[in-house]
């Protein structure tokens, strides 16, 4: 038996001791030539399904501890990005709960400015987990133990959706040893807004006995609006646009302005109960609920249709409020069998979204493109998309993980997931029919325009307004997986992994263009509706190989060959009639990423941890969202091939007893490597060999500096400065695709100082010191007033108070 390097490799159930170390985020490592207080803190993770020091795991993993999250004021995903080099997202503000737009290692094919109201059909390229539950939320990052960021394809252990990587959010668990509580409150002010921001958080832990405890966290956050809407259409009592100058036939929009339109609220509560049922078995039941509400989106007005304009103004016709609600219930069971630890993870998830989006510009573009035929040249088209979606999922995973300090380590498991979603989209008319009714008898005595419309269109519920869509998706995934590691010597090990999966995807859809009537219906019905249902089945397998070698006590070389994938499926495109789409686009295949990575990680003198990795990922059958046919029905198609190559460096250094610096930088070269003809409404666009992958900056970097200053009265000061940089990026493959621009690079900086005395602390902070907008995506359709860019929060100055109670 030669495996003696780390006793942490055993997964024998030691939750009380281990979870305490993990919650603290540290295990101190020794150094012969340095003071005990100078050693770098070493984090314990469970990303490989066993507890290990992050420096002993032979892949590139970044960890953001709960302490760092609190000290830097990280609140959500958009904040977290600034601490993790190589992780990219489009800042959608409070609407980020609808779609997972995370990008890692350059693997992305969707436009970062894609409509954020309607959930994408295509699966994300980065999978996300709450503990062991595969769920995406725009999570309020409170009472978090750590965030684990696994770079590169993780298909064997984490399954579908992990082509670029995996992000795991690990919550603090109940503590059976002592009662504790904390309460914090903050107030801040953001540039360009008149009102204040507020936040409140509470965490309480209560032992119920020596073997059971309950933990509750809850909070509320309110962000004031900062964007002014300068072109809002005025509606009358019937909900129709008031014609300019009182001219019902030829008048355009009567408009007004509204200040600070993009305020938002977040409410959350999480309760968990831990029970040591026996000496060898523990159960953790968790219930999580979160609500996000947004008054409107945070846009900038692009006056040039590209990247320049008024940063805190919005030119859209309507405000775009949204509500997002999520419930997650999970049960985790662990039992130590001696030779191995058995784990069961059961999760029930339900999320719902209601949202509105201003799409007046789309209808104006259609009318313009058809020479005024589509909507008779109406001078004040005004349409709002109203969307309601419900998404439910059941996930079950059983795992068996070997224990003991043996030459062989192994993980084996089975996985099941059933996800159902139903989305109803309705484009509501706010002027067209009223305008039609005002136009006199011009069609050979048939009456008003509205009378003419009524002869070939029957707009009865639910087929009212201009567009209607009811989409239902059902996805079932079954898999077996495993990894096997052999330790040839204390310094050399090799791992092989596999995953075999069986998947079934069903899609059905009803789409209608009521104003188009029988002309747009394959069967000639008067409501212009068409329906379609399709299904597809897939089965395949993935593999992984990893080898690592300790060059010396402090440095490890590793090599990884791994695969990741996103599941295939079926589109519910109609194949006949006005909206017909070529039948070859009904089924879309899984895409697959193959990663080759070489890296070195280790420690300098006990004070600095480092990781350096070089990788190349070949991506085949790329999936991307499209709008197909004359109706622009959302779906997924396969592209061809792409390649992403890059270098990543991360340093974590305890320079002195009181000074720590974390630094990371990544370079990514991600591009199409084979021409692909991609469906684009009724036409095709070509993603050409050499085109960049959308939304991927070449360079990203982050730095976090912490300095502690003890004071004579027993109190202390903690100073923090952190910053992030991302270089320019193109928002689509080329100019043949919509919303294509090159957004400039930008950097953002934040600073804070915290005074602490015993259990009480005060934190003063400035976020986004330079008031950088940070443009990350655009929508630049035909109508100039509708050109928008997605930006982040402006400069925010505030103070936060915190009090902790510990028994």
Show the residue positions of the predicted features.
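Outer-membrane beta-barrel domain signature, strongest for Gram-negative TonB-dependent receptors
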Residues: 249-411, 417-421, 425, 609-611
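Transmembrane beta-barrel wall of Gram-negative outer-membrane proteins
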Residues: 193-295, 327, 391-392, 396, ...
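Gram-negative outer-membrane beta-barrel transporters
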Residues: 491-494, 609-618, 637-733, 800-806
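Acidic, small-polar-rich N-terminal luminal/periplasmic segments of exported/outer-membrane proteins
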Residues: 38-176, 598
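Structural signature of Gram-negative outer-membrane beta-barrels, strongest in the C-terminal barrel
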Residues: 274-280, 400-403, 413-417, 471-617, ...
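C-terminal beta-signal and adjacent terminal beta-strands/loops
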Residues: 4, 428, 661, 724-734, ...
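Solvent-exposed loop segments that connect transmembrane elements
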Residues: 226-260, 297-317, 358-386, 426-470, ...
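Membrane-embedded beta-barrel scaffold of Gram-negative outer-membrane proteins
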Residues: 201, 330-359, 550-566, 587-654, ...
């Amino acid at each position: 038996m030669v495996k003696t390097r780390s006793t942490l490799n055993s997964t024998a159930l030691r939750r009380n001791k281990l979870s305490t170390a993990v919650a603290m985020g540290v295990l101190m490592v020794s150094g012969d030539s340095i003071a005990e207080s100078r050693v770098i803190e070493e984090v314990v993770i469970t990303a490989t399904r066993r507890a290990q020091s992050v420096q002993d795991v032979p892949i590139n993993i970044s960890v953001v501890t709960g302490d760092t999250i609190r000290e830097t004021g990280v609140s959500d995903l958009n904040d977290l990005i600034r601490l993790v080099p190589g992780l990219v997202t489009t800042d959608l503000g409070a609407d980020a709960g609808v779609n997972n737009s995370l990008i890692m290692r350059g693997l992305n094919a969707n436009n970062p400015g894609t409509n954020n109201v309607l959930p994408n059909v295509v699966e994300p390229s980065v999978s996300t987990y709450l503990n062991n539950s595969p769920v995406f939320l725009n999570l309020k990052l409170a009472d978090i133990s750590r965030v684990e960021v696994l770079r590169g394809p993780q298909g064997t252990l984490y399954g579908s959706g992990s082509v670029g990587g995996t992000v795991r959010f690990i919550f603090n668990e109940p503590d059976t040893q002592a009662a504790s509580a904390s309460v914090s409150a903050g107030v801040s002010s953001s540039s360009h807004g008149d009102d204040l921001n507020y936040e409140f958080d509470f965490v309480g832990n209560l032992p119920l006995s020596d073997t059971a405890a309950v933990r509750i966290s809850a909070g509320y956050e309110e962000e004031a609006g900062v964007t002014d809407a300068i072109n809002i259409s005025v509606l009358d009592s019937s909900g129709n646009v008031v014609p300019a100058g009182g001219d019902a036939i030829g008048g355009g929009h009567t408009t007004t302005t509204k200040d600070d339109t993009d305020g938002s609220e977040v409410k959350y509560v999480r309760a968990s109960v831990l029970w040591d049922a026996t000496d060898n078995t523990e159960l953790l039941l968790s219930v999580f609920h979160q609500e996000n509400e947004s008054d409107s989106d945070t846009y900038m007005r692009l006056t040039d249709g590209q990247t320049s304009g008024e940063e805190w103004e919005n030119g859209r016709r309507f405000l775009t409020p949204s509500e997002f609600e999520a419930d997650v219930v999970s049960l985790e069971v662990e039992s130590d069998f001696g030779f191995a630890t058995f784990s069961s993870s059961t999760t029930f998830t339900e999320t719902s979204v209601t949202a509105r989006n201003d799409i007046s510009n789309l209808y104006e573009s259609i009318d313009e493109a058809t020479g005024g035929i589509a909507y008779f040249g109406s001078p004040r088209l005004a349409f709002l998309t109203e969307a309601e979606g419900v998404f439910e999922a059941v996930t079950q995973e059983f795992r068996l993980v070997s224990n003991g300090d043996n030459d062989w380590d192994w993980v084996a498991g089975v996985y099941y997931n059933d996800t159902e979603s139903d989305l109803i989209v309705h484009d509501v008319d706010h002027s067209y029919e009223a305008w039609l009714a005002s136009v006199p008898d011009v069609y050979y005595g048939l009456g008003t325009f509205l009378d003419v419309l009524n002869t070939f269109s029957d707009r009865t519920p639910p087929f009212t307004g201009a567009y209607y869509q009811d989409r239902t998706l059902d996805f079932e995934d079954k898999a077996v997986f495993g990894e096997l590691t052999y330790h040839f010597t204390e310094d050399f090990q090799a791992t092989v992994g596999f995953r075999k999966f069986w998947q079934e995807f069903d899609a059905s859809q009803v789409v209608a263009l009521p104003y188009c009537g029988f002309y747009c219906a394959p069967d000639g019905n008067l409501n212009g509706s068409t329906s379609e249902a399709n299904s597809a089945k897939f089965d395949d397998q993935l593999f992984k190989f990893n080898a690592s070698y300790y060059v010396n006590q402090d440095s490890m070389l590793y090599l990884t060959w791994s695969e990741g994938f996103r599941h295939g499926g079926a589109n519910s495109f109609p194949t006949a009639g006005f909206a017909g789409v070529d039948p070859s686009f009904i089924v879309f295949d899984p895409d697959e990423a193959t990663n080759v990575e070489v890296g070195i990680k280790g420690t300098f003198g006990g004070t600095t941890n480092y990781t350096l990795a070089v990788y190349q990922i070949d991506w085949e059958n790329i999936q991307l969202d499209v709008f197909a046919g004359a109706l622009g029905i959302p779906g997924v198609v396969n592209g061809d091939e792409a390649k992403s190559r890059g270098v990543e460096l991360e340093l974590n250094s305890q320079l002195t007893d009181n000074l720590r610096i974390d630094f990371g930088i990544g370079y990514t070269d991600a591009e199409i490597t084979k021409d692909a003809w991609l469906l684009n409404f009724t036409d095709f666009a070509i993603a050409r060999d050499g085109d960049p992958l959308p939304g991927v900056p070449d360079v990203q970097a982050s730095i976090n500096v912490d300095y502690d200053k003890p004071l004579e009265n027993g109190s202390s000061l903690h100073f923090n400065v952190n910053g992030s940089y991302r270089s320019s990026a193109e928002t689509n493959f080329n100019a043949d695709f919509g919303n294509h621009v090159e957004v400039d690079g930008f950097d953002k900086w934040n600073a804070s100082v915290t005074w602490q005395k015993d259990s009480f602390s005060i934190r003063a902070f400035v976020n986004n010191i330079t008031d950088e907008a940070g443009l990350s995506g655009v929508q630049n359709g035909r109508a100039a007033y509708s050109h928008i860019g997605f930006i982040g929060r402006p400069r925010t100055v505030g103070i936060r108070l915190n009090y902790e109670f510990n028994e």
